[in-house]
Amino acid sequence: MSSLFSSFCLVIAIFESVVGLLGNGTIVAVSSTSCIRSKILSSYDVIVIFLSLSRFFLQLWMILDFLLIFFCQPSYYEENLFVTFKTVFIFLNSYSFWFAAWLSVFYCVKVASFTQSFLSWLKQRIASLIPWMLITSSLFSFATSLPFFWDSYNAHSNFTTPLTMTNSSKRITTRKTNLIFLILLCNVGIALPSIMLVFSSILLIRSLWRHTRQMQNNATGFRDPSLEALIGAIKTVFSFLLLYITNFIALILILSDTFVPLSTEEAICVVVVAACPAGQSMVLIWSNPRFRELLSSILHYVNSCVRARCS
């Protein structure tokens, strides 16, 4: 590592990814068990399961990536491991971004009240569109990540062969052009679902806030559980949106190669990218009693085991 601070940030990122693994694993376990018991696979469960699975594998991949950087840094950057890891990282990030957007759209369509004909039509047919959401997300994520592998592999091969004086500048210019194209392609892969999520979240917050104000005007002075639930929903959506935007900005900075590899600035972005998916999984858990109950049981069991060994 280039500095002690970068090493410290890498350790923090690994810890955050482990927390994310625990959170997303909890969500997948609870949702899958619920579907098996009820023998009903709801639209919400499908979206949440695929979102949590994508983030589970993303953070597992990030942990492996961080460990290789920490212990095998020279071979990691000199060989094709870097290309493979970054390509899979882009695919999993794009996939999780898409399903986070679909979850926000689902909340918006199901919870918010609209008068527009398209949104009313979408509200009635959201369940039948779930398979198309899965296919679209998979194809789009694959399409935006695969060219990076091809071009990066070719660029790596070109740089390992001798360059003559007549064509060296041409190759470097071509590589820079290809790199710019890849950066734009990767950014589009996460920008489109981000626009969907921001737009649907704003609509949802606006609808919930309007409904909250109406209930406050009709309140009798006693604590209304429905009103508290609405305020909690607004906080949940806003927290989810804030984490998503923060993750988007940090990821764009990493993919755009804005900072020198292993610099202090990039290390901070890595910590943010590892923290935001874990934070979003915690937001989902604490907003859902089913998820919260299982996580509390797991933490209680772990705490009991630690106390038993220490005593």
From Swiss-Prot:
Extracellular compartment spans: 1-9, 77-87, 150-178, 257-266
Pfam families linked to this entry: TAS2R (PF05296)
Keywords associated with the record: Cell membrane, G-protein coupled receptor, Membrane, Receptor, Sensory transduction, Taste, Transducer, Transmembrane, Transmembrane helix
Gene3D superfamilies: Rhodopsin 7-helix transmembrane proteins
Membrane topology note: Multi-pass membrane protein
Stretches assigned to the Cytoplasmic side: 31-55, 109-128, 200-235, 288-311
One GO-annotated biological process of the protein: response to dextromethorphan
Keyword Transmembrane helix: yes
InterPro entries assigned to the protein according to its UniProt record, in alphabetical order: TAS2R
Entry GO MF terms: bitter taste receptor activity; G protein-coupled receptor activity
Consequence of substituting residue 247 to A: Loss of quinine-, diphenhydramine- and coumarin-binding, strong decrease in diphenidol-binding, small decrease in chlorpheniramine- and chloramphenicol-binding, no effect on chloramphenicol-binding
Distribution of this protein across tissues and organs: Expressed in the oral cavity, as well as in the gastrointestinal tract, including in the upper palate, tongue, proventriculus, ventriculus, duodenum, jejunum, ileum, cecum and colon.
GO CC annotations, alphabetized: membrane; plasma membrane
Subcellular location: Cell membrane
Residue intervals passing through the bilayer: 10-30, 56-76, 88-108, 129-149, 179-199, 236-256, 267-287
Role description: Bitter taste receptor. Binds quinine, dextromethorphan, diphenhydramine, diphenidol, chlorpheniramine, diphenidol, chloramphenicol, chloroquine and coumarin, this latter being a weak agonist, as well as epiquinidine, ethylhydrocupreine and quinidine.
Protein family according to the UniProt entry: Belongs to the G-protein coupled receptor T2R family.
Protein name listed in UniProt: Taste receptor type 2 member 40
